[in-house]
A protein has these predicted regions:
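Lectin-like carbohydrate-binding module/patch detector with strong preference for beta-trefoil
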Residues: 1-235
Length: 235
């Protein structure tokens, strides 16, 4: 699905205003990662991300549109992103981009994790009567648990996460992290799963068998890790 954003010139209220079209939400976040970490300092200093659909640039330093054509910035996105220069303030026209409703993938924020195909199915860690969590993670249509997702690298709170980033998923109230057993069961552990990437969270987990107790369905299913997983999203 296409992703849209605006760019505004911080030095003027009337010029160098753009609408950007990205091939996908992931491309938008990856473009921002490339720009914000570029060794071409005039670009990393010029362009700022206000939120997922609004950026600013200091045209006196660097024009955001040029990020696609200046070597060392974000030329790898030339075929996946385009900028359209909007009318100046006096043009009396504005191209309204469609609002997109989603959770921004910011490191150390907390999220519900739900199925992209069946958005009423959520990751869930049930609590026992003694307030201790079971060690298994489930998928439920009636219950849900908030998880904190953060980059594995320390000191990166507030950073936009992209697919290649290594992450840690925790349940803050329990001081436990998501881990995966050798058989693929998703569990809560004191140490997180090593090498887990953000793209794995979104595509390498699947729903297992229904859980029964005393012959009765508990309306939950096991969560499993697999290379051929389902699509998940943060909410």
């Amino acid at each position: 699905m296409l992703h849209y954003a605006y760019v505004k010139n911080i030095n003027s209220n009337s010029t160098y205003r753009y609408a950007i079209v990205f091939a996908s939400r992931a491309v938008a976040d990856e473009w921002w990662h490339a720009v914000s970490t570029s060794a071409i300092v005039k670009f990393s200093d010029s362009i700022r991300r206000v939120n997922a659909q609004f950026y600013t640039h200091d045209v006196g330093q660097a024009n955001a549109a040029d990020s696609l054509t200046v070597n060392g910035v974000a030329t790898q996105f030339l075929g996946k992103v385009f900028f359209t220069l909007l009318d100046d303030l006096g043009g009396r026209q504005l191209s309204i981009i469609p609002p997109l409703h989603f959770a921004d993938h910011i490191s150390e924020n907390s999220f519900y994790i739900r199925s992209k195909v069946s958005p009423y199915e959520y990751w869930y860690c049930p609590l026992l009567s003694n307030s201790n969590a079971t060690n298994l993670v489930y998928v439920s249509r009636t219950e849900r648990t908030r998880f904190r997702v953060c980059l594995a690298e320390k000191g990166t709170a507030g950073t936009v996460m992209i697919g290649s980033d290594e992450i840690v998923i925790t349940v803050p109230s329990l001081s436990r992290s998501i881990d995966v057993t050798d058989s693929g069961q998703v569990i809560l552990a004191t140490a997180p799963q090593s090498g887990l990437k953000f793209s794995d969270l979104l595509s390498k987990f699947t729903v297992g068998p229904t859980v029964y107790k005393d012959g009765q369905s508990l309306d939950t299913r096991e969560l499993l890790y697999t290379d051929d997983g389902e699509k998940w999203e943060l909410a």
